[in-house]
């Protein structure tokens, strides 16, 4: 029943998104009584590009889901990625910043040409993990490193993301650059929030609230009524996995 309902919907939705994208692009290229600000134009052009990408993705027999991890140094993005993958596919290190360039992890069953051009220019790593056949995992540069180019690299990749996991930890869950990018992109893609290293969370934040409650309070003030917030212990799970007792359900 589900397949018979979803397939006609996808066939209808894809051309509708393509038409909407073309209409928006034509409107942007036309004349306007009042000139558009650079910020408004950039946002609308980004929306038109998103519509085009989504229309093309829905035309595929099996659309790919791009899951992007975003966060600062030392929050455990690479470790979390390994935990989500159910095996070691990303290199985690104590050297910081660990992630200097975007790394795209895709299943061996996916032909590289199916990847978005923005992803094809990143470092590509093939995996054979069950359950990742239609999922692309992207580990992005650390936002709060001294390399300002990291932000630009992330900005080039964000339009490709279907889901962004905003990863933080007890010490670092509301960094300025990450929060600004989140506010800019929140209307255009799905965000979920991860507080990693939760096993170390034993003290309140400077506001007197626990980190998860402090983050939820900030999200509520920005208009999020029911944000997805996950509290994880990725390293603990990876360690258990190494001895054969790990389960993603306990992540």
Where are the language model's segments positioned?
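Short glycine-/polar-rich loops that comprise or flank the Walker A/P-loop
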Residues: 99-102, 133-134, 159-163, 187-191, ...
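Phosphate-binding/switch loop-helix module in NTP-utilizing enzymes
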Residues: 125-149, 153-158
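Conserved nucleotide-binding/hydrolysis micro-motifs of P-loop NTPases
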Residues: 110-111, 142-144, 171-174, 198-201, ...
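Inter-motif core of Ras-like GTPase G domains
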Residues: 148-171, 181-190
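Conserved G1/Walker A P-loop phosphate-binding module
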Residues: 2-138
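Alpha-helical scaffold elements adjacent to nucleotide-binding pockets in ATP/GTP-utilizing enzyme cores
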Residues: 83, 153-156, 160, 177-184, ...
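Canonical P-loop GTPase G-domain recognition
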Residues: 199-251
């Amino acid at each position: 029943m589900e397949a018979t309902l979803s397939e006609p919907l996808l066939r209808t939705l894809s051309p509708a998104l393509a038409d909407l994208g073309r209409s928006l692009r034509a409107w942007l290229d036309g004349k306007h009584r009042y000139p558009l600000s650079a910020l408004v134009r950039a946002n609308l052009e980004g929306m038109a590009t998103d519509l085009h990408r989504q229309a093309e993705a829905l035309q595929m027999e099996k659309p790919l889901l791009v899951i992007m991890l975003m966060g600062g140094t030392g929050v455990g993005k690479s470790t979390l990625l390994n935990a989500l993958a159910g095996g070691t596919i990303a290199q985690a290190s104590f050297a910081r910043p660990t992630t200097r360039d975007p790394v795209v992890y895709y299943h061996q069953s996916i032909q590289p040409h199916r990847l978005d051009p923005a992803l094809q220019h990143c470092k590509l790593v093939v995996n054979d993990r069950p359950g990742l056949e239609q999922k692309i995992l992207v580990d992005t540069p650390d936002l709060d490193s001294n390399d300002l180019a990291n932000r630009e690299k992330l900005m080039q990749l964000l339009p490709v993301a279907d889901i962004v996991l905003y990863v933080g930890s007890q010490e670092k869950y509301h960094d300025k650059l990450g929060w600004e990018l989140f506010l800019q992109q929140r209307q255009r893609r799905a965000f979920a929030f991860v507080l990693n290293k939760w096993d170390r969370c034993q003290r309140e934040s400077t506001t007197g609230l626990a980190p998860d409650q402090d983050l939820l309070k900030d999200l509520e003030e920005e208009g999020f009524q029911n944000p997805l917030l996950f509290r994880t212990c990725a390293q603990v799970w990876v360690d258990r996995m190494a001895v054969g007792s790990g389960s993603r359900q306990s992540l």
